[in-house]
Amino acid sequence: MTLCVGVIATTRRATLGTTKTRAVTAPGVIELGDESDDQVVWKRLGQQGVDKACELWSAVNSEAAAAAKGAWAGVKPAHKVFLSDILASPKRNAFVRKWIETDVTYASFIGVMHLGCLLAPFTFTWGAFKCFLAMYFITGCLGITLSYHRQLSHKSFRTPKWLEYTLAYCGALAVQGDPLEWASSHRHHHQHTDTPKDPHTPYEGFWWSHMGWLLDNEATIERVGDRSNAQELAAQPFYRFMEKTYMWHIAASAVALYAIGGLPWLIWGFCVRTVWVYHITWAVNSVSHCWGSQEFNTGDLSRNNWPIGILAFGEGWHNNHHAFEFSARHGLRWWQFDMTWMVICVLKFLRLADKVKLPKEAQMERMRFAPAGGASA
């Protein structure tokens, strides 16, 4: 969602029956207010599964569980994913349903990447390991967290177009989709966080939120198939080109790694790195919506999880992120390590980034949970 002066963007979240209004009062500054008379109406469907979800989640976030109760009306259930019943709504059996071509393609590629990792011990060299680390940073930090997430999805800072496109190309090499697809899907996630319309809602089960949503595109496309929320990206020829030629760039990167370093570089720089970045990224959607701490009252299940914060270059400070989606900085406290924010600071110092958006202290105080026994800020 594009943020600009004089524009008011309203997002509705079922939290204590209120609707939060986000108003842009200055470049990069958003004030939050409550419309106390505006109630969010939820219809009930699949009561048994919803009751189960509420019971299991009440210990970690009773407000969010209550908000989601009965929210499944009009949404087709996802297919059941192995070990998904940590927290789940009623599902259709995955083994008797028809797998569409996209499901087979995704499952096959992800499976081949994991099988390739079995060769890692037999192809290890220090050069291959250095290639892994370099590609981990290039695709994971520069590509996914810096470009796809903070710049393209949330517009938290601006760079020259040549740099924007270069960073987005790094994101494409992570094999998580083209820039348009990724940004659009992520905006749907924030619009419908932890509700049935969230593409990777934890209420469909831990494994669904981790990776199952990628393997059931019939259900996922119903939730994120509309790309109209990323029209400003679709209007740019570069992103349309990447959408049409995406897989060719993936294949070219694999060929290049093999040509430079042989099988060790292919296994470590492509297979191991891809699987590693996959699970780190997916853990933000799953682990950081299940385990960790909440500093801000976001009305959802987002958590600050420090191991994911480190491994995902700052993305694990997820409660902070859901409180201030526009913020270029996710680690809002000095001890919350956020490498992506450090990269943004370097770009800003080099005058390669501007319009960097950050929350004000007053905004953070307003969103914080009140101390035990204290009054709300």
Predicted segments, located by residue:
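Non-catalytic, topology-defining segments of multipass membrane proteins
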Residues: 2-282, 327-377
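Alpha-helical transmembrane segments in multipass membrane proteins, preferentially the mid-helix core
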Residues: 283-287
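Short alpha-helical linear motifs
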Residues: 158, 207, 290-296
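Active-site-proximal inter-transmembrane loops
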Residues: 230-237, 291-317, 321-324
